[in-house]
A protein has these predicted regions:
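Charged, glycine-rich intrinsically disordered N-terminal tails and low-complexity linkers that flank
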Residues: 1-87
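Mg2+/Mn2+-dependent nuclease catalytic core
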Residues: 80-82, 92-93, 99-156
Length: 156
């Protein structure tokens, strides 16, 4: 069974937990934010592995607890960089699919590490048994750093 099929089966089995079909939601939707409520996510992995006595980790843990206590479903603010990414991510996914020779790079809203639902990832695409994270830099600086110097932002 592929990563995609396993992830979608896992989500479908959790439909009664959420009260909606988690296989049909999109990343960034209110339902997706609810699914991430109080969950350690790969997007903040740098905060977790930083060490237990670091400010970044302590702040992240406090945010997770606050999110649960206050039922805060995440940052609702929009940034032009986020809007840019949402606009160009499908194009980047299509280009990656063509470059790698895969007919289709599928999207998964979110998948949990296990039934505890405490750790999750939201890959931008899945093909075969590989997950990918797609970046569509807002400005050319990061793209040029990567292309010319093989530099990638640590949080990526």
């Amino acid at each position: 069974m592929s990563i995609f099929d396993r992830a979608m089966a896992q989500l479908k089995a959790m439909e009664n937990v959420f009260g909606f079909d988690p296989t049909t939601i999109e990343q960034g939707s209110l339902e997706w934010k609810i699914m991430r409520l109080g969950v350690l996510t790969a997007s903040k992995a740098d905060k977790i592995v930083a060490g237990k006595d670091t400010d970044g980790r302590a702040t992240y843990m406090a945010e997770l607890i606050s999110d649960i206590v206050n039922c805060n479903s995440g940052d609702e603010s929009n940034f032009k960089q986020t809007d840019w990414g949402k606009l160009y991510e499908p194009e980047a996914r299509t280009a990656l699919s063509a470059a790698l020779g895969f007919a289709d790079i599928k999207e998964i809203p979110l998948t949990y590490k296990d039934q505890s639902m405490r750790i999750a990832v939201s890959p931008d695409g899945v093909f075969g048994n590989v997950c990918c994270e797609i970046k569509a830099p807002f400005d050319g600086t990061n793209h040029i750093k990567h292309a010319a110097f093989d530099k990638v932002k640590p949080e990526w």
